[in-house]
Design a protein with these regions (language model features):
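Short loop/turn motifs at secondary-structure junctions and domain boundaries
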Residues: 3-6, 49, 68, 85
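A short hydrophobic beta-strand segment most commonly corresponding to one strand
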Residues: 103-140
Length: 142
């Protein structure tokens, strides 16, 4: 078993000092080797988080596009199947699929000079996008 914790990268849509949205790539919280249950071999895991407000599964049809908007709350978006993209006001377009986690954290975004606010997003390809949405409490550190 590996002696060093694996590196996991997360995609973070947030706001910069000017209130406009930017895309960052951040490391996941630190993981330690720990047991997860009696008789189960230990695994690399981050500390459990107790900041979940709600969760749901969404299915977005091929061709769906959200238009420019803010996230309704701080939320994790985790694709189960299909692919999608997110574009922030800084012009960065990030494509994601299963195995990639995205933290939508642009609830305080302000309009840019063209009136766009927050981010735009859409489904890639001819398959529906199925995502798990985990909405967080407003004051959680994620």
């Amino acid at each position: 078993m590996a002696e060093t914790a694996p590196t996991v990268e997360l995609i973070h849509v947030t706001t910069g000092p000017d209130g406009l949205t930017v895309t960052e790539r951040l490391p996941a919280p630190e993981m330690t080797m720990r047991p997860v249950g009696q008789g189960i071999p230990p695994i690399w895991a981050s500390d459990p988080q107790a900041d979940v407000q709600s969760w749901s599964i969404w299915t977005l049809p091929p061709g769906w596009r959200g238009g420019w908007h803010r996230n309704p709350s701080r939320q994790w978006v985790m694709p189960i199947s299909g692919r999608w993209w997110v574009e922030t006001q800084d012009g960065v377009r990030t494509e994601m699929g299963p195995g990639e986690a995205h933290l939508g954290d642009d609830t305080n975004a302000v309009p840019d000079s063209t009136g766009r606010v927050g981010h735009d997003s859409g489904v890639i390809g001819d398959e529906p996008l199925v995502v798990m949405i985990v909405q967080l409490d407003d004051h959680s550190p994620a």
